[in-house]
Amino acid sequence: MKAKDITLVALMVALLAICSQLSIPIQPVPITLQTLAVLMIGFLLSPRNAFLAGAIYMVLGLIGLPVFAGFSGGYQSFISPAFGFIISFMAAAGLGAWYLQGKTGMKHYIIAGLIMTAVTYLIGIPYMGIILNGLNGASLSFYQILMAGLIPFIPGDLVKLALAVVLAKQLRPRLVSESN
């Protein structure tokens, strides 16, 4: 791994940790800027490095560094309803970066962003449901789980996607060579 790659991965992990703290603490999952950071990671890094940035972030939190929302961290985070979303960051960023390889058009950024957003929800919502219903003893319906973990987030996710596309279109040519 080149020094430039290590630096970019570290910067993206730091961005993700910072964006995690910019939150509105609602239950069961806070509204944060984490997904903005995940979009930027997928837009700016190679698939391998994007996956790695998500993995490093998750490991840092699990070993106790307060990088998760609300300055939380530790192995107990694993049983948080929000942890499925954290798990999803690796796959989401990696798949978005994979799709975007060699593509530069606005349409491709939007598609990559939608892929990343979908992956985040496809992993995060079932995990949240398992924790809430299985571990916490709630008896939420599928609709109630969607109302808690998806519906309130859609407007903000669309705004974050638009912002990430604008930022990445400006930053990517300066930061990333397509040979990554």
Segments from the language model and where they lie:
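Short helix-perturbing small/polar motifs within transmembrane alpha-helices
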Residues: 7, 11, 18, 75-122
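Membrane-interfacial segments
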Residues: 23, 27, 68, 72, ...
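Interfacial aromatic-anchored transmembrane helix boundaries in multi-pass membrane proteins
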Residues: 20-33, 58-92
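Hydrophobic transmembrane alpha-helices
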Residues: 1-51
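Alpha-helical transmembrane segments and their cytosolic interface
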Residues: 1-10, 144-180
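Active-site-proximal inter-transmembrane loops
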Residues: 69-77, 136-152
